């Protein structure tokens, strides 16, 4: 059996047998809003107690507070829900959308291509079995979150994300959890409490977006903006030579489990329409696409044969399926193409290269630019956010921050203001490949020219010498630009520049980028960002191994690495690990020093460095006698348990 067929069969088995799989020692809980159907998911990590004294027979313990963390996994980790990928997810937002009474059900699909696919009986086996009804705005209504925010309306979606951003952090009582460095936020406004009104105001000003198409009611609202937690996007999608619908659905579920805040379906292979339907109906997070990829497939891959009519039909098709945001490369103008002639790597964006070829073939202006207002009209009818693509992003550090890149960026700023005229939500895409010392200039230029619309970057990669490790080279740049103010980071996997990522690559890319985003939140001084770090550090110092595993971004890998060398159960309570062993564990020695100081009723926070020499000598003699009396052994050996064969 071929590797490709084997992968598809394994993915099919995953879909057929998928069941709820909670994280270790965690439970799904929901924070309630002002109405019963605003139920915001969080993951609550239960911690073990801390030994604080007593004896072996009568130990005294102190409880540790559970830690609540942001959760993107949807009902896939909720034991109260029965998973059935063939039926899709609950329609969380359906009632909210209906209550606004500004949309109606369409009698049929608006897209000619979508109607053709529906009529094709040969696709019945591939097609998702429970196609939803299609909604569109009534008449001239605009049904975007930006429109409501500008009208002073706080929607359930806005309240949902306000609760989600706070995630119960204000409920913590342990002062050791709440300590936090001030951070440097570079002008961001980070309130101690995110309120629904704050969310509304940020959206109204264009500084944040909630991507939530009215035809994707299954999605759990989330917010992208400089003044909120840094978010992470994961890319999935098939190609002409790899992957299947089953594999892409498996990647979707896998990505949300490991923290993807949004997912982009970048499919360029067969059955793009059907693949996307399966993804949308089973996605608890917003889904983005690059409509140009599918439009190109419709003209058999010949860029110069693209037309506005084909593109418009594709936009309608995807908007009515429920795509939450479109990447549109409307800022790449004909006159910018010659600016790339002296680049080391030319135009590396797929969408950008397609547009550049079309412009040169016809010697006409980019049709996405000339028809941009029509694009905005479509988006306003379905609440599709625009992610304005950087078709001229640098593909090597040699090309970073050049004339072509920043010329396009300025045009994206002009397009942002046009989109806002139609109440369409906007974010701006950024590079790319940028060395560390040039990264901040990218953020500064974006804020200056794009009116503080959220920035969304691919990395950036900080060096070009690491094929196979580009998740690391880009994670460095992602952490930096997130600190400077980037709102969402698009992950890079180890397969970047080498091939289509598989399931494990998706996980590796996501964990790397969740780390980068969290590091950025810490550096910005985002309120509550350090709580999880403090909890894990406390568990580490107290040798609560199980808590260390469970608080980690990847509990599975943390446990596996520990158990490679200390697989016995006693290793989970030992006061050392295999790095230093029992004799050289700095934390164990530090604990012994602290315990001794406490037993001597010394103040461990204030040490008298001018203690009389006579007192020091007496104390040293006491400890010498104690050491000799105990057998003169520096460390007492632990009783080892046999390893079961």
UniProtKB/Swiss-Prot annotation:
Q: Which GO terms describe its molecular function?
A: 4 iron, 4 sulfur cluster binding; carbon-carbon lyase activity; zinc ion binding
Q: Which InterPro entries match?
A: ThiC, ThiC-associated_dom, ThiC/Bza_core_dom, ThiC/BzaA/B
Name the cofactor(s) required for activity, per the record.
[4Fe-4S] cluster
Q: Which residues bind substrate?
A: 235, 264, 293, 329, 349-351, 390-393, 429, 456
Q: Which residues does the annotation say bind [4Fe-4S] cluster?
A: 577, 580, 585
A Pfam short name: ThiC_Rad_SAM
Pathway(s) where this gene product acts: Cofactor biosynthesis; thiamine diphosphate biosynthesis
Cofactor binding: number and manner: Binds 1 [4Fe-4S] cluster per subunit. The cluster is coordinated with 3 cysteines and an exchangeable S-adenosyl-L-methionine.
This protein's GO CC annotations: cytosol
| Residue positions binding Zn(2+) | 433, 497
Q: List the disulfide bonds.
A: none
UniProt keyword list: 4Fe-4S, Iron, Iron-sulfur, Lyase, Metal-binding, S-adenosyl-L-methionine, Thiamine biosynthesis, Zinc
Reported EC number(s) for this entry are 4.1.99.17
According to its UniProt entry, one GO biological process term is: thiamine biosynthetic process
Renumbered to this chain, the signal peptide range is none
Reactions mediated catalytically:
5-amino-1-(5-phospho-beta-D-ribosyl)imidazole + S-adenosyl-L-methionine = 4-amino-2-methyl-5-(phosphooxymethyl)pyrimidine + CO + 5'-deoxyadenosine + formate + L-methionine + 3 H(+)
Q: How does it assemble?
A: Homodimer.
Per the entry, what this protein does is:
Catalyzes the synthesis of the hydroxymethylpyrimidine phosphate (HMP-P) moiety of thiamine from aminoimidazole ribotide (AIR) in a radical S-adenosyl-L-methionine (SAM)-dependent reaction.
Read off the HAMAP family from this record. Answer: ThiC
| UniProt record similarity statement | Belongs to the ThiC family.
Q: What is the name listed in the Swiss-Prot or TrEMBL entry for this protein?
A: Phosphomethylpyrimidine synthase
Native species: Vibrio cholerae serotype O1 (strain ATCC 39315 / El Tor Inaba N16961)
Which gene carries the instructions for this protein? thiC
